[in-house]
Every structure is written in structure tokens, then in C-alpha cells.
Amino acid sequence: MESRTKLDYSETARSYTENKSGGNDAQRINGVYSSSFFVVDFSLRLLVIGSTFTAAIVMGTNKQTAILPIVGPLSAKYQYSPAFVFFVIANAVACGYTLLSLIFSITGKFTSTPLSVFLLSVTDLVMVALVSAGVSAAAAIAYVGYKGNSHTQWGKVCGIYDRFCHHGAGAIVASFVSLIIFMVLTVMSTYSFYRRTSSAR
């Protein structure tokens, strides 16, 4: 009877030790994942800030005056196209949001609870939609400027306003880069929310 009691005690102690060790391993793995996730998320959001800021500034300061025969001087400015105005606003909003989310991530506001991670993934998705709409509208106008449209008799203007078109193209490329990164961030934040909710069960 005594030997059986000792055997049961030994098995219980071994089981407790294994469970504790397994729990420590899981915590260690989660800790490594969390730190790696933070580094990648932080780096990508820095890139988004840089690309959206560049896109908004380059397009927002884009203008050129050309001298045309008979007509005289004519100016091209981003304000003359509602699509370009929306492009600047969309990238400025995305830049401001990303800066705030970066600050909140550093302080742990967006990574402390599953709800905050869920809100982060939703707002990242909203930014994907906003930047996508802005860059698509600007790209459509830029294409007409480069190629024209023979069906509607819209002529090319980039042969006249070459610098304006080149700067606009650079801003659009920068915005496309930020759009791709936002998509990656949305996937990451959604997966992080999934991990937190599944581990809480």
C-alpha cells in the first residue's frame, strides 16, 4: 500500500513537472513570436509612413507652367484634378493613422487585448480601401495624361507638362508601395487576433 502511494505521488510529480515545462515552452514560443511580430510590424509601419508621406508631399507640391504657342503660359496643378486632391487626402490620412498606430503599438495600446488587436486589423483594412481608392483614381487620370483617349478626343498632356507627370508618377508608385504594405499589415494583424482568441479558449 505504501509503495503504491509513493508510485502515485511520483507519477503526479512527474506529470506536474512535464506540464509546467510544456507551459514554459509555450510561453517562451509565444514570447519569441510576440517580439518578432512587433519588430516586423514596427518596421512595416515605418515604411508606410515614409511612402504615404512622400506620396502626399510630392503630389501636393506638384505643379508646372508651360509656354504654349499662341495660347501663352498655362499651369498644371494637382488642385485642378479632384482625383489628385483625393489622392493627397487619402495618403495624408493614411500617414497620420499609421503614425498614431505606431505610437500606440510602442505603448502597448494596440497589442494588450484581443479587442485592441481586432480594432487594429479593422482600421488597417479601412486604410487599404482608402489608399486603394486614392491611388486608383490618380492612376486613371495619370494614364489619360500619358496616353490620351482617342475615343473621347482627349489629347496627351505629358508631352507638355513632362515634369508634372513624372512627379505625379513617382507619387503614385510610392502610394502603391504603401498599399501593398498595408495589405501585409492587415494579414498580420488578423492572424495576431486569431492567435490571441484561440489561445484564450
Swiss-Prot record:
UniProt topological domain (Extracellular) ranges: 58-83, 146-167
Membrane topology listed for this record: Multi-pass membrane protein
GO cellular component: plasma membrane
UniProt entry keywords in alphabetical sequence: Cell membrane, Membrane, Transmembrane, Transmembrane helix
Lineage top rank: taxon: Eukaryota
Compartment(s) where it occurs, according to its Swiss-Prot or TrEMBL record: Cell membrane
Keyword Transmembrane: yes
Cytoplasmic domain ranges by topology: 1-36, 105-124, 189-201
Transmembrane segments: 37-57, 84-104, 125-145, 168-188
Coiled coil: none
Pfam families: CASP_dom
PANTHER family: CASP-LIKE PROTEIN 1U1
Subunit annotation: Homodimer and heterodimers.
Family statement drawn from the similarity comment of this UniProt entry: Belongs to the Casparian strip membrane proteins (CASP) family.
Name of the molecule in the record: CASP-like protein 1U1
Organism: Picea sitchensis (Sitka spruce)
